[in-house]
Amino acid sequence: MSTSSYIDQIKNEISEKVKGRAIIAVSGGQDSSLLSVLASQVLGDRLLCVFVDTGLIRIGEVDRVRKFFEEHAMNYRIVDASKRFLEALKGITDPEEKRKIIGKMFIDVLNEEAENFHAEYLLQGTIAPDWIESGGQKRDTIKSHHNVGGLPKEMKLKLVEPLRDFYKDEIRAMSRELGLRTDLQPFPGPGLAVRIVGEITPEKLDLLRRATRIVEDKIESALKPEERPWQYFAVLLPVKTTGVHGDRRAYGYTVAVRMIDSIDAMTGTFTKPSWDLLEDIANTITDEIPDINRVVYDITNKPPATIEWE
C-alpha cells in the first residue's frame, strides 16, 4: 500500500469508529501529532486535543505544543497537572510502578476533560512497537507502555487506536506526506520519569531538564538533520561520584548520554559520534550544572537493551 492509502485507511477507521465526540492526548511527538491532524480533519469540532503538563516534560514543551495546535487550527486544551503527578510519584523507585501510576493519573485527567467535553471516545497514538513491548499477542512483557500497560482495565472512554499496526518509519512517511515535521524525536509518554533512574524529585527533574537541553542543543548545532541520531537524550543516574570543582572536592550526580540509530524502534544500534562532540557535551554539562560531575556514554544496542533506560 502507498503512504496516501495508509492515510485514507486511518481516516476511514476514525470515521467508522468514532460516532460522537472524542479526545486525544497530544504529547507533541510524531505519533500523536500525526493522529491529531488526521482526526481533526475527520472530526472537526467533535475532537478535543489535550496536552497534559505532567511536570515531567522538557524545557519549552508547552509552548511548542501550543504553537502546533494553533498552526493547525485545532480545538485544544492545555492542562497543568504537574502537582498531581509529582505527588503521586513521591517515593516511587520501581520503573514499572512509575509507568502504571503515570498511566492511571493520565487517564484520570483525560476522563475529567472528556466529561467536561461530553466525549465518549479516546483516540491514542499507540503504534506497533508499543504493544509488542507490552506483551501483545502472546509476547512476553518487556515493559508496560504508557499507552498500553498503564491503562486501567475499566475505562469510561471507548479506546480507538488507528495507528496500532504501523511502525515508526511508516508514521514518519505519513507525516512527510502531510507536510508535518519529521525530525521530531520520539519522547516517552511518561516523560522524564523514565529517564530518572530511581525516585523522582524536583531537584532531579531540574538537573535532567538542563542536561537534556544541552544534549539536544549540542547535537542539533553540530549535525544536519539527516546526520542526527534517530533519538538522543540524557539519563540521570542514582549514582553520585567524587569529582573536583576548582581546588575543592565535589560529590555530584552522574548523567548517561544515549544516542541511538533505528528505523522502526524495534531494534537499534548505538550511534558512534565524534569524540569532539561527546567531549563538548560532557564539558558543557559539567561546567553549566555543578551538581553533575560525571558524564558517561551508553554503547548498548537494542537488543539487549531497550532504547529508554526504564
Swiss-Prot record:
Q: Which SUPFAM superfamilies match?
A: Adenine nucleotide alpha hydrolases-like, GMP synthetase C-terminal dimerisation domain
EC number of the protein: 6.3.5.2
The GMPS ATP-PPase domain is annotated at 1-187
- Which residues participate in ATP binding? S27, G28, G29, Q30, D31, S32, S33
Instruction: Give the reaction(s) catalysed.
Output: XMP + L-glutamine + ATP + H2O = GMP + L-glutamate + AMP + diphosphate + 2 H(+)
Gene Ontology cellular component terms for the protein in this record: cytosol
The alphabetized UniProt keywords are:
ATP-binding, GMP biosynthesis, Ligase, Nucleotide-binding, Purine biosynthesis
Q: Which is one GO molecular function term here?
A: ATP binding
Q: Which PROSITE patterns match?
A: GMPS_ATP_PPASE
What pathway does this protein act in? Purine metabolism; GMP biosynthesis; GMP from XMP (L-Gln route): step 1/1
InterPro entries assigned to the protein according to its UniProt record, in alphabetical order: GMP_synth_C, GMP_synthase_B, GMPS_ATP_PPase_dom, NAD/GMP_synthase, Rossmann-like_a/b/a_fold
Subunit record text:
Heterodimer composed of a glutamine amidotransferase subunit (A) and a GMP-binding subunit (B).
**Could you tell me what this protein does?**
Catalyzes the synthesis of GMP from XMP.
Q: Which HAMAP family match?
A: GMP_synthase_B
What protein is this chain from? GMP synthase [glutamine-hydrolyzing] subunit B
| Species of the source | Thermoplasma acidophilum (strain ATCC 25905 / DSM 1728 / JCM 9062 / NBRC 15155 / AMRC-C165)
